[in-house]
């Protein structure tokens, strides 16, 4: 058996030394050192040998195995070096060839919807403004006519940011939070500008809510127009123009009285159902109408917070959930599908 091991080692040395390709080296590894290789075949009968002879033969077998593993590793290095050299000696790169295009994914339905909303209002003459997502309680609530004891605060379950997380940015007399709407941007925008003002404010907002129609993070687009003599009729005209541009010229709008602390009067805006064209279906609960946004004339207290004289200027504001608009446009039943990163869903857009 010792002679068989030595003969196997000599044969393996010769063949490994002559192997020049990675595939050949791998084939030799399997042949000699694989589970069903020649070395395993020789060692299969060791159990029948006397203990002393078995110990001596085991030492020889381990030595042969270690040597073959080393030779195979060296052969792999030689084969890889030879392959690289052959590649370098081959045809060079033709820099005159046209470049290869990079495959890109499609736009996310929320991104596409928000961009189109902003683009539509830009064509109506609105600028685009933005603000911080970590907001002060004052701008998120108090400046929008929501004092600390206002019951409407309960309508928005809020994520507050603790002092340790916020660090030095926290003011001693203010609590910080993740903004629950993009309306704070309206106040910040007015504080830095004089009328007339016309702007939309897209962005992410956060509320402690999660179900089939709500997520803890979602997107809104707010709009604000301030000037002298602005009327509710102008609000209706602007939103009607947006609806027809976004949903189609056959889409009608309906205004319903509502309540928002930062507008007075306030109205919910409905459109004819995008699924049944107003005839009535399960999507619109047989009413023919779908709610899309809230709106109203800016409350005098909001103007006062922004340093405007409510006796000199008037204005209107509106806000819409981007995911809600996207669900209506693309007929998506479950809001959570937009945030699950399922390629089968996203590639449809």
Curated annotation (Swiss-Prot):
It catalyses: tRNA(Phe) + L-phenylalanine + ATP = L-phenylalanyl-tRNA(Phe) + AMP + diphosphate + H(+). SUPFAM superfamilies: Class II aaRS and biotin synthetases (SSF55681), tRNA-binding arm (SSF46589). Mg(2+) binds at residue 264. Keywords: Aminoacyl-tRNA synthetase, ATP-binding, Cytoplasm, Ligase, Magnesium, Metal-binding, Nucleotide-binding, Protein biosynthesis. It is found in: Cytoplasm. It is an enzyme of class 6 (ligase). Disulfide bonds: none annotated. Its cofactor is Mg(2+). Belongs to the class-II aminoacyl-tRNA synthetase family. Phe-tRNA synthetase alpha subunit type 1 subfamily. Tetramer of two alpha and two beta subunits. This is Phenylalanine--tRNA ligase alpha subunit. It comes from Myxococcus xanthus (strain DK1622).
């Amino acid at each position: 058996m010792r002679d068989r091991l030595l003969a196997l080692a000599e044969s393996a040395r010769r063949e490994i030394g002559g192997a020049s390709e990675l595939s050949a080296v791998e084939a030799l590894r399997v042949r000699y050192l694989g589970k069903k290789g020649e070395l395993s075949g020789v060692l299969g009968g060791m159990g029948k040998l006397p203990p002393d002879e078995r110990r001596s033969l085991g030492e020889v077998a381990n030595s042969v195995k270690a040597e073959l593993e080393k030779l195979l590793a060296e052969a792999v290095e030689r084969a890889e070096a030879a392959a690289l050299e052959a590649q370098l000696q081959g045809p060079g790169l033709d820099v005159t060839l046209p470049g290869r295009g990079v495959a890109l994914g499609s736009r996310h339905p929320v991104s596409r919807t928000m961009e189109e909303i902003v683009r539509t209002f830009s064509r109506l003459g609105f600028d685009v403004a933005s603000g911080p997502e970590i907001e002060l309680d004052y701008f998120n609530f108090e400046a929008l006519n929501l004092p600390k004891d206002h019951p409407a605060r309960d309508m928005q379950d809020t994520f507050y940011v603790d002092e340790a997380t916020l660090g030095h940015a926290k003011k001693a007399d203010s609590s910080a939070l993740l903004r629950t709407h993009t309306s704070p941007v309206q106040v910040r925008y007015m504080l830095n500008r004089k009328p007339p003002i016309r702007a939309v404010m897209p962005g992410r907002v956060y509320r402690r809510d999660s179900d089939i129609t709500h997520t803890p993070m979602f997107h809104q687009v707010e709009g604000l127009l301030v000037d002298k003599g602005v009327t509710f009729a102008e609000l209706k005209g602007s939103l009607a123009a947006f609806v027809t541009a976004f949903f189609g010229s056959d889409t009608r709008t309906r205004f319903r009285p509502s309540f928002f602390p930062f507008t007075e009067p306030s109205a919910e805006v409905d459109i004819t159902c995008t699924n049944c064209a107003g005839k009535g279906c399960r999507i619109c609960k047989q009413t023919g109408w779908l709610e899309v946004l809230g709106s109203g004339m800016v409350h005098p207290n909001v103007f006062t917070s922004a340093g405007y004289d409510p006796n000199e200027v008037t204005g209107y504001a509106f806000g819409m959930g981007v995911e809600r608009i996207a669900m209506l446009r693309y007929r998506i039943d479950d809001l959570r599908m937009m945030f699950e990163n399922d390629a089968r869903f996203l590639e449809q857009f």
